[in-house]
Amino acid sequence: MIYKVFYQEKADEVPVREKTDSLYIEGVSERDVRTKLKDQKYNIEFVQPVDGAFLEYEKQSENFKVLEL
């Protein structure tokens, strides 16, 4: 399944909505995704599963690229 991860680039700073980035990653569960990203030092705010019509909508974005770790 593909997940959309909302994160802050620096884990040691207070989260600010305007600085939130997102990425897409494939995993079997939210825990699996968080485990794959733990070495990136991101401040992960939210992990959202993406499927069905929502996935098709996200694929239309020019920024849609599934991160492979």
Swiss-Prot record:
<dbReference type="GO" id="GO:0006351">
    <property type="term" value="P:DNA-templated transcription"/>
</dbReference>
<dbReference type="GO" id="GO:0003677">
    <property type="term" value="F:DNA binding"/>
</dbReference>
<dbReference type="GO" id="GO:0000428">
    <property type="term" value="C:DNA-directed RNA polymerase complex"/>
</dbReference>
<keyword id="KW-0804">Transcription</keyword>
<dbReference type="Pfam" id="PF07288">
    <property type="entry name" value="RpoY"/>
</dbReference>
<protein>
    <recommendedName>
        <fullName>DNA-directed RNA polymerase subunit epsilon</fullName>
        <ecNumber>2.7.7.6</ecNumber>
    </recommendedName>
</protein>
<keyword id="KW-0808">Transferase</keyword>
<keyword id="KW-0548">Nucleotidyltransferase</keyword>
<comment type="function">
    <text>A non-essential component of RNA polymerase (RNAP).</text>
</comment>
<comment type="similarity">
    <text>Belongs to the RNA polymerase subunit epsilon family.</text>
</comment>
<dbReference type="InterPro" id="IPR009907">
    <property type="entry name" value="RpoY"/>
</dbReference>
<dbReference type="GO" id="GO:0003899">
    <property type="term" value="F:DNA-directed RNA polymerase activity"/>
</dbReference>
<comment type="subunit">
    <text>RNAP is composed of a core of 2 alpha, a beta and a beta' subunit. The core is associated with a delta subunit, and at least one of epsilon or omega. When a sigma factor is associated with the core the holoenzyme is formed, which can initiate transcription.</text>
</comment>
<keyword id="KW-0240">DNA-directed RNA polymerase</keyword>
